[in-house]
Amino acid sequence: MGNSATRRKPPFDPVADFTPITGAVYFSYFLYVPANFPAKTMKEFMAYAKANPGKINFATASMQTRITAADVVKKNGLDVSFVQYKGESAASTDLLADRIQAMFSSTTQMPLVKEGKLRVLGTTLPARNPQFPDVPTLAESGIAGGEFGAGWLAFFGPAGMPRPALDRLNKALLGALENPEVQSRIKAAGLVYTPIRSPEAMAKFVREESDTYRKIAVELNLMQD
């Protein structure tokens, strides 16, 4: 969604070019820092960033995390240097080596937190991730911005899908997603089963998500050709 929202001439229209079938899962983003970083909380991170303008290299590995990070930085008046990576693997390597000092990412970095190699300070979205209840939200820590920052996965079909086929697929996919074994795997991966389960609700969500990301991308001057 972030990639199409930041393109002046996107290669596809996420609203018009597909038929939403159902949501699947969503995941919040977490702010990770090296294990030796001076801050241990979000408030300490903000205080350090404000006391050391220009010293934090902030990695982003997708347009979604770039928009989330830029929103937090702008709304809290921080001065950081953004470093764009093509993928999380390279960004994670540099974060471990302290070549960068902060990164928003999904739960994929949590094993490194458990090993004591990284530290997690906070998470986006209004509510805590149920799989990591000890990690406070940015809002709880009094940090502005980033509340929309989340990744999600859903099922889509081609535009103009016949309603009978759409209904059959929706029923079949929800049945598979609600299988106890699948639910167990979703939780084990740190994901959350989506509450967006009807084609209509998913279509509404996609429209709103596209509008939100495009509006913020324009405000943050992140639009690309």
Predicted regions and their residues:
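Hinge/capping helix and adjacent helix->loop/strand transition within the periplasmic-binding protein
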Residues: 5-90, 138-143, 152-185
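Conserved functional loop/turn residues at catalytic and ligand-binding sites
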Residues: 41, 99, 117, 142, ...
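Alpha-to-beta junction loops
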Residues: 52-56, 78, 96-103, 117-119, ...
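Structural recognition of the beta-strand scaffold that forms the well-ordered cores
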Residues: 57-60, 81-84, 102-105, 119-122, ...
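Hydrophobic hinge/microswitch elements
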Residues: 88-91, 96-98
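Short acidic active-site motifs
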Residues: 90-91, 108-109, 201
